């Protein structure tokens, strides 16, 4: 089978992060023949279980949630059409670190973190696992989190650190040649959510009386993963694939409920809210679409 000429690598912390963050973008590029590779850094062992019949899988009981989430992730990837998914270093090499909420509204490290938690991972060792993937897949574009991990989750921050460091190391010819031939990723993006889109969504929900999942957020108090529009550099219009994104999110059945805020936004605003995904460029040169301040293609400007 021929290697796709365009290749996209996404690095995420837990199963479901990919579907929430870039599910529509992934489906769009798969449909266009782009090679899409997802690397998930942990098994999601510490995720909050929202389905009562799976409660026994929690870390303080049977501790089998990772196996269930592995199945859910596989189902989500099937929905999106992604055939190349890997766990960083292999399944359960790194454990979900968990988190707790800070009074300021962002996530911070939990009081009791497992010794094998991703948050405690040796940075070079973890990066080497990803270097090997980068040198094998040879993506032109990589997507991961910003330096705050979107909202402060320790695993998101660590995924950012590992991804950015691995991208540097993978390009160095003399660095561990046993991990493959060097490869320099041309463009790196950090996923983001548009502030104007979020404000419009919350306003619409409040007016319809369905904003119960967004208490505490207003025009001046948006979730920390929301980015003001002037900081965004790319907007991928994947509205034609929004239904796939929603189906992929539903596949993560232990983590996302159909009566939660994600689906409230979808039910009220349709494909508009989840079919457009936004990014900030962290490496490379942005090439905005004609008549726009934003790129409409993550591969824009590349001679792939």
Predicted regions located by residue number:
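Active-site rim/loop-helix segments in enzyme catalytic domains that contact anionic ligands
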Residues: 1-138, 169, 269, 280-283, ...
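Metal-dependent de-N-acetylase/amidase catalytic core
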Residues: 1-11, 99, 108-304
């Amino acid at each position: 089978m021929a290697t796709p000429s365009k290749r996209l690598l996404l690095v995420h912390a837990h199963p479901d992060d990919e579907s929430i963050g870039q599910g529509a973008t992934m489906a769009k590029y798969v449909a266009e023949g782009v090679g899409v590779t997802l690397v998930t850094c942990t098994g999601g062992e510490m995720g909050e279980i929202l389905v009562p019949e799976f409660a026994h899988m929690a870390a303080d009981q049977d501790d089998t949630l990772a196996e269930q989430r592995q199945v859910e992730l596989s189902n989500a990837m099937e929905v999106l059409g992604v055939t190349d998914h890997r766990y960083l270093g292999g399944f359960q090499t790194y454990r979900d670190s968990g988190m707790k909420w800070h009074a300021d509204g962002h996530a911070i490290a939990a009081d009791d973190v497992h010794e094998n938690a991703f948050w405690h991972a040796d940075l070079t060792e973890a990066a080497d696992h990803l270097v090997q993937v980068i040198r094998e897949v040879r993506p032109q574009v990589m997507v991961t989190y910003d330096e705050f991990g979107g909202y402060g989750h320790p695993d998101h921050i660590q995924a950012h650190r590992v991804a950015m460091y691995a991208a540097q190391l993978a390009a160095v010819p003399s660095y561990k040649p046993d991990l493959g031939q060097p490869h320099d990723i041309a463009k790196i993006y950090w996923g983001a959510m548009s502030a104007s889109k979020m404000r419009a969504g919350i306003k619409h929900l409040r007016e319809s009386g369905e904003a119960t999942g967004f208490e505490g957020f207003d025009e001046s108090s948006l979730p920390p993963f929301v980015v003001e529009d002037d900081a965004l550099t790319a907007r991928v219009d994947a509205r034609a694939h929004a239904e796939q994104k929603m189906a992929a999110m539903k596949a993560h059945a232990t983590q996302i409920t159909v009566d939660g805020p994600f689906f409230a936004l979808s039910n009220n605003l349709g494909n508009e809210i989840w079919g457009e995904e936004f990014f900030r460029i962290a490496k490379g040169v942005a090439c905005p679409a004609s008549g726009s301040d934003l790129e409409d293609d993550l591969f824009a400007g590349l001679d792939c």
